[in-house]
Amino acid sequence: MRHSKKLVFIHIPKTAGTSLRLLLESNYNEAERRSIYSHKDLDQQLKSALEDPGVKCIYGHFPLRPVIAESNATVVTLFREPIARSISHYNHYSKRINEKHNELMKGIESPEDFTRLVQSNYRQTAFMSGYLNQKEFLEDKEVLQ
C-alpha cells in the first residue's frame, strides 16, 4: 500500500538519481507522476504539481524550494561522495554532448580545472539550499530578512 503523501525526489546530477527515477517511473503511472527539468517558472511548476490531487510523485533536477519545504510532501534525494561526484560530473561534461557543455569546458584541461568552476563546487549543497547560483540567492530579499 502506498503512502498518501506526495513524494518529491530532488535529483542532484551525478548521484545515481537516474536509477531512482527509473524505479519511480516503474511504480507510478504517467498520470501519477510529474517530471520537472526546466527551471522556467519553477516555483509555479512545483506548486501546480503539489496541488494536483492526481500527482503522487514529483521528480527532476530542481533545488529544494520553499514551496516544497512548506508542503506536506515526503522529500527524498541521493548524495554521493563529493570527489567521486565531481569526477563523474567532469567526465560527463568532457563528452561535450551539447553546446552548453562545449561552452562550459572551454579552457578546462583536467578534473582539477573543472573543480574551480563555481558550477561544479558544492553542487549537492546548492541543491539542498534551494539556490543553484549565488545571483539567485543574493536577489532573494526574503533570505536576508
Stretches with model-predicted labels:
Residues 40-77, 84-145:
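PAPS-dependent sulfotransferase catalytic domain
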